[in-house]
Amino acid sequence: MEINEIVRNIFGSDVPLESPVTKPKKESSKHSRISINLNSVNQYIETTLGENAPIENVQDNRVGRLGPNVVKFDISTHQGLFIISPNRLSINSQSNFSTMKANVAVYKGKWMYELQLGSKGLMQIGWSTAKCEFNQQLGVGDTVNSYAYDGNRVRKWNVATHKYGEPWLPGDIIACAIDMDNGTIDFCRNGRNLGRAFENITTGAGFAYFPTVSLALTENLTANFGSTPMRYPIEGYEPLQAAPKQQIDQATLLFNWFLRITEVINARQNVNDENTLRDGNMSVQAYLMCLTRTVVKHIGPLVTVPYIAEYILVPFIQQLSESKTDPPLLLTCLDLFWTFLEEHEMKVCLESTVMYLLSAFRHVSLLLEYPDQCKSLHLLTKICQHSSTRQYLLQHLLFDRVRFANFMHVKPLDEGGLADVVKDVWWEMSPTDSTIEVNKASYLNACEKIKTAISEVETLQVELLVILLNNSDGNEKKPTSRAIFLRKLKRFVQENLDTSRTLPITLCCFHRLLVAFRVLWDAEVGTSPVYIPCRAFYDASIDHSRTERLGGVLSHLNKTFRNELQQLLGPEHEVITAMDQAQDSSNVHNRTRLMDLPIVNPTFSRVTGTDASGQGNSMIFERVGYFPYTREDRSPLRLGPLNPTTSLLELLDSIILFYHIVAKKQLAKVAILRNSMSEYITAMQDTKAKLEKAKKKKDPMFQSIQQELLRTINVFNTKLTEQARHMAWIRAAVYSKEKQSQIAWLLKVVALTLKNASLEENMFSFVPDFYLDALADLCVGLRNHMHPTASIEQVPNYREMFLDIAEFLCEHFMDPRIVNANSKSSLLLTLAGFVFNPLTLEILENVPEESRIKVVTNLLKSYDNRAWAESNWILVRFWQGNGFVFRYEKSPHLSKKVGPKLLQQESISQPIKPCPSAVYQNHVRDVLLKNPQATTKLLNSLLNQLNWAFSEFIGMSIRDDCYSGS
């Protein structure tokens, strides 16, 4: 292949090149001829780009605009506290009501800017003049010459307020457009004009308007004043920041050349002939690399410009990702970028790309097919197939900058979208209403349609996670993507202990992680049933250093059961070695030297990828309960491929903790919506019954009553229609059979983990406390939150599953190995939950008799060193409804109590329908009769508690009488 042929295929015929037929001078060589041609190419590129070079330091002098070229929020104008991004385009309010203006004003012409909402709460966005003064009560729209729209309250503001627009949602793009020539202001939501908001605004001499936003506490948004292309440009309106036209022209040329080079390089990767240039002594591949460097050195500075990154780079990457070549063009492109771009250029390039994809993904979809979300996931997945890029994104972006959990979410459609999909609404009623029941088939079909659309997005999300969990891209010098992901996920889960993230996002993330785990487990391990062996809780293979254990504090357990640990692990195991070193260090009163002490076990050094005197010690000390410096895991990542079983079990462990910390809350939240809907249904049925009675009355006074009742029924119908559409989404996305089966599968895993750990005698004490909490959470989720919408009978072998759990609860109630106070309470409340539910009480009655008698015996023990109220409550439940004083669901004197309603949660304080158990009544009788000494002790404890309770009650009554008398 000739040099001229290569160059002209890439750059065209205008490049002046030395002809190969020209006889070179004596001092010329083949090498110098290649250099001359490369210089010619470089000069051609610079000359061509110079024709479109932007003029330096030119002021944006468009008529009607005042201010600097680069538009951003002006921190000198802020009122209240904000968190603001480095580029001063994203803000988060930290005061009750905070206001900030941009640094550019307009006085003539038509102008616009866009805001992407990060939340949906109280925000006023619009325009104001320089003379408008704001405080923590007054924001934009609350003063004379300021104008605003608030989609939270669906109103427009200019001192007075009027209904305007439509409700907004997180991810919405709100455009704010001002026409200074005609004195009008308009707002658009996701490209749809909301109508004329204001007319005849004050214009003329001395009046220039600044983009202005006012946000309530924790509300947040990101502005686009023109630094990137407008998502929904409005014809005739200009962005406040001008597009970099010359740089766009340069980038267009460069990326066209780069595409041709990439295609040639890619095509030659599978070609073995003509490796050397015909007219030189350089390989074709090396010459192509020289050309690539010549082009990419000009691309580098351009991709750091946000507008170029979004307008040119992202579509370019999208184009490459759609090619069907082998190897993929995109991977070749990324290889070249990593080779020739500067580090900071590559960082900005990837960050701009991922931030754009996240912005597009978070945008509220107008179509059920989620085209923008699928497109973003497709492209991110393709990018992550490149090893170096994937590892960089995991280390620096997906957890630290953009939160990968946002890519795991599937947002509901807005009200209009749901109404288009769920045209006919239905809800369960008893007795059934024919006018509602006729819509059932259509409603359930709509639910299936939603579920099908969601499942396509979920499949892409799981595919992305599987790629991020790649375990084959490490070597002796670098960790795998899985190692990075697990470390970052652990920190992400721990952060949720202290912060409150959006609940729907966390639940979606939980389900995707669980499905990805099962896909990887089946592919790499394949054993069944799945559970976490107890050894993982005491051999430091999984980091539980920041976690309470069932048996108490980890360092105490290590000391108490040292001999057993040594027998199980061996005297040279890293856990034993670390304990010895910690003991030696404490003897010289110098805890800070723990990091300097060597781990003598060479096996562990190989696992962690450090030498015996390396920095891996911190990890082991922390994992066995010693914290030499801080609680942050600063140990080096393990190098090379991880053990598939151990690494996936670590992932599963994090998933279980993640569910316990946050994911369970969303299930409870949607259950509240379902219960609220049930209350509306009951209220409407009662109102209809009253209407029928009123119709039978002939008194004219009842005519007005009928009108009022009809109005009330219409209000209920409107609310129920809205809730029924939301429930359609919940049925498809949260309470689907697939999601229910995932929760049930995880419950079996947790139950089997606890059951097998219990067989290891004292080692059971090392089980992290959140496993017992997760057992309770998963039981409640299946039994109370998902059921009856997702009937528990759908779960295969659900009775056997709950029977195993019930037996575990009976056997481990008051287990001496469980020392942690919270764990004791959690186990007791889980047992109580089984007692008050008819389904699980029946299962509890079918556990082996030995286990039933054991739990009753423990319940009847005296109240030394344990909570007595919960035990009494369980005992009382065995009789409630089976005796003259226990026949009420709610005490009569409380049945008409007026006051705020409590959230419906599983709690012993909630009124519950009686559900007596003759089986356990008989066990209580038998245990009391067979153990007279223990019975006497129990009765003494009961009488003491009654004496104390009555004394307190009488004392309070006397004090009340004294206060009322005075």
What is the meaning of each model-derived region?
Residues 235-241, 537-548, 677-690, 806-807, ...:
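Eukaryote-specific, cytoplasm-facing alpha-helical/coiled-coil scaffolding segments in long proteins
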Residues 1-370, 374, 379:
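PRY/SPRY (B30.2) beta-sandwich protein-interaction domains
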Residues 253-311, 875-965:
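Extended alpha-helical scaffolding regions
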